[in-house]
């Protein structure tokens, strides 16, 4: 592994330098330009942290829809300076790359290959750079998710559950990983009975499902559930004691019932916009979860043996079919991309084409969105059409990734360089 350390340090150094440069540039843009570089939520985080230092509820700050833990973590913004939070998120960004590197090495990737995947898909990727340097907290969730999945594959169930519980507390979406993690833990290193060689489960409709449910409830699954549940319950009880119902309402319930009628990448946004005052609005919002639920169940059963790949598909599907979809949500699945890249066997031309389509889909959406946001033109239909096209592009990319993905055993082979 020694041969990979200099390369990893160089990649981390380059990633750090790029992110710090963007943080400093953000100070300039915020001072002289109309459109601020810093994420609007970062001001919300800082205001909530200031309220916490005064012994008040962070939910006194309008639009603070997060766990109070985030406000607590950013209290140095008040005492040391407002750059602290951005530097914390940048550190989380780099830590996520470090965890991804270790996961790749465990899965059998050479030091050079692991370093290259982390650099290309994360460290030198402009999207994660921009998200963390603008003051968005997604990197903290990313490092916890990566650590949880890596520790599950490494057999450290207790520590994996600890990271998973913290991740779910920060953001609800990792809760969707519960089923594939449980299925992955059921075998404890042995293949599940009735599963195909490619990891696809084969079972009868009733008897097979029941047998699988019984098998899933083994020692590792119960330990994982107990630890993760205890972490989540302890934090929930603590913050409920401190801040009462408004904590549950803003940190959890708001996100479950959220119906954002502002323009975003979601294919549902225009429908929710038009039906905002309808008596069927709430029911339509709930119905939007059904395609997600069905697809997530299918992916869980089909690909649980390769946990990182399964969770990558999970997250990409969840984001693409969600009622609300913004650019920062892409980080949720991009952080898993470095780990699955070595198993995607496609030509570089096809890969470049898929990357071009992904960026082109965003560009086609951003053009009418800009005209609406800054020029006041009524471009809702064009934005919705671009969102539908982007959903088709994302679906096509996922189909291509699945069809060109070659699964390998999750027990990493012995690497020569230790």
From Swiss-Prot:
GO terms for molecular function: glycolipid 1,4-alpha-mannosyltransferase activity; mannosyltransferase activity. It is a multi-pass membrane protein. GO terms for cellular component: endoplasmic reticulum membrane; glycosylphosphatidylinositol-mannosyltransferase I complex. Part of the glycosylphosphatidylinositol-mannosyltransferase I complex that is composed of PIGM and PIGX. Keywords: Endoplasmic reticulum, Glycosyltransferase, GPI-anchor biosynthesis, Membrane, Transferase, Transmembrane, Transmembrane helix. The keyword Transmembrane helix applies. It is found in: Endoplasmic reticulum membrane. Its main location: endoplasmic reticulum. Residues 28-79, 158-220, 303-323, 373-378 are lumenal. The chain crosses the membrane at residues 7-27, 80-100, 137-157, 221-241, 282-302, 324-344, 352-372, 379-399. One of its GO terms (biological process) is GPI anchor biosynthetic process. Belongs to the PIGM family. Residues 1-6, 101-136, 242-281, 345-351, 400-418 are cytoplasmic. This is GPI alpha-1,4-mannosyltransferase I, catalytic subunit. Pathway: Glycolipid biosynthesis; glycosylphosphatidylinositol-anchor biosynthesis. Its EC number is 2.4.1.-. Catalytic subunit of the glycosylphosphatidylinositol-mannosyltransferase I complex which catalyzes the transfer of the first mannose, via an alpha-1,4 bond from a dolichol-phosphate-mannose (Dol-P-Man) to the glucosaminyl acyl phosphatidylinositol (GlcN-(acyl)PI) intermediate to generate alpha-D-Man-(1->4)-alpha-D-GlcN-(1->6)-(1-radyl,2-acyl-sn-glycero-3-phospho)-2-acyl-inositol and participates in the sixth step of the glycosylphosphatidylinositol-anchor biosynthesis. It comes from the Eukaryota. Signal peptide: none annotated.
């Amino acid at each position: 592994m020694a041969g990979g350390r200099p390369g990893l340090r160089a990649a981390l150094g380059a990633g750090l330098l790029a992110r710090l440069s963007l943080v400093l540039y953000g100070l300039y843009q915020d001072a002289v330009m109309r459109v601020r570089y810093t994420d609007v939520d970062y001001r919300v985080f800082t205001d909530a942290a200031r309220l916490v230092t005064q012994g008040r509820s962070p939910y006194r700050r309008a639009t603070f829809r997060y766990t109070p833990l985030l406000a607590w973590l950013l209290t140095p913004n008040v005492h040391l300076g407002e750059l602290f939070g951005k530097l914390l998120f940048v550190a989380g960004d780099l830590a996520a790359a470090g965890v991804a590197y270790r996961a790749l090495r465990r899965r059998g990737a050479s030091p050079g290959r692991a370093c290259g995947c982390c650099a290309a898909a994360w460290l030198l990727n402009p999207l994660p750079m921009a998200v963390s340097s603008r003051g968005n907290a997604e990197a903290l969730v990313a490092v916890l998710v990566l650590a949880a999945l890596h520790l599950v594959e490494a057999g450290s169930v207790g520590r994996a559950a600890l990271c998973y519980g913290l991740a779910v507390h920060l953001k609800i979406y990792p809760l969707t990983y519960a089923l594939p993690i449980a299925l992955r833990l059921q075998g404890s290193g042995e293949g599940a009975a009735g599963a195909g060689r490619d990891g696809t489960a084969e079972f009868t409709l009733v008897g097979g499902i029941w047998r699988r449910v019984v098998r899933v409830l083994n020692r590792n699954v119960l330990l994982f559930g107990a630890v993760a549940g205890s972490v989540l319950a302890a934090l929930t009880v603590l913050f409920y004691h401190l801040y009462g119902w408004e904590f549950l309402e803003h940190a959890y319930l708001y996100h479950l019932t959220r119906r954002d009628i502002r323009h975003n990448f979601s294919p549902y946004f225009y429908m929710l916009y038009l039906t905002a005052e309808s008596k069927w609005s709430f029911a339509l919002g709930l119905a939007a979860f059904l395609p997600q639920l069905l697809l997530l169940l299918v992916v869980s059963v089909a690909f649980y043996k390769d946990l990182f790949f399964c969770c990558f598909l999970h997250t990409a599907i969840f984001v693409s079919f969600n009622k609300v979809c913004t650019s920062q949500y892409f980080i949720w699945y991009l952080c898993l991309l470095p780990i699955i890249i070595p198993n995607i066997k496609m030509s570089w031309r096809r890969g470049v084409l898929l990357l071009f389509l992904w960026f082109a889909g965003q560009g086609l959406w951003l053009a009418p969105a800009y005209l609406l946001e800054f020029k006041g033109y009524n471009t809702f239909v064009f934005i919705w059409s671009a969102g539908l096209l982007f959903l088709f592009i994302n679906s096509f990319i996922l189909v291509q990734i699945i069809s060109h993905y070659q699964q390998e055993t999750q027990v990493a082979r012995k690497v020569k360089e230790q």
